[in-house]
Amino acid sequence: MDIFLEQIVTRKRRALYELLFYACWVLLVLCALVGLSGLVNIVYTGADGGLGFRPLAAGMAVVFLGGAFLLWRASMRLRTEYDYSFTNGVFDVARVMNGRKRTYLTSFDVKDLRAAGEEGSGAFQTCARQSGVQIHRWYLNKEARKYFFFFEKKGARHLVVLELNEEMEKTIFNRRYLSAEVWDGAYKSI
């Protein structure tokens, strides 16, 4: 029997982030309008019929259009979700930006893990202190219970920190998938 489980992680205080998202878009429109007006005023016609150049208008256009671009990028990050899926011992992690753009982050087989457990445990500290370890924190809620997975992939060592719900936790952290030397905690029963 195949075991498939999927979890979508969203922010707990979503109303605040939605308010920030719309505030970013209001500021983005204002910055874009000011930047475009700066573009229109770069070149002007003088009283004698000759063309003139306004460097201040060019600078204003660059600053405000750049600000609009940065606000657009920031607004996409305000609506970030993480998608965790577990299929027969293979764990996949993806990030979804603004409900549209899905980015694959990593995939690992649970049987290939070197260590796993709760963040902050002794095993976590040991893995985090090793040299050359890439630490990935793919969670949204700082107060949530977080778990780490330590594995080697393509010659690089990775320490991934995720926030799992109870169902995902029970499915992954049992003897069927994790051996005793890997799991830093009590086994869960399915």
Per-segment meaning from a language model:
Residues 35-55:
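Membrane-interfacial hairpin junctions
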Residues 126-185:
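A membrane-cytosol interface segment of integral membrane proteins
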Residues 25-36, 62-70:
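Hydrophobic core of alpha-helical transmembrane segments in multi-pass integral membrane proteins
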Residues 85-103:
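Membrane-cytosol interface motif
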Residues 1-32:
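N-terminal membrane-targeting/pre-transmembrane regions
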Residues 106-126:
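Structured surface patches comprising rigid loops and adjacent beta-strands/short helices at the edges
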Residues 186-190:
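Long, low-complexity intrinsically disordered regions enriched in Ser/Thr, Asp/Glu, Pro/Gly
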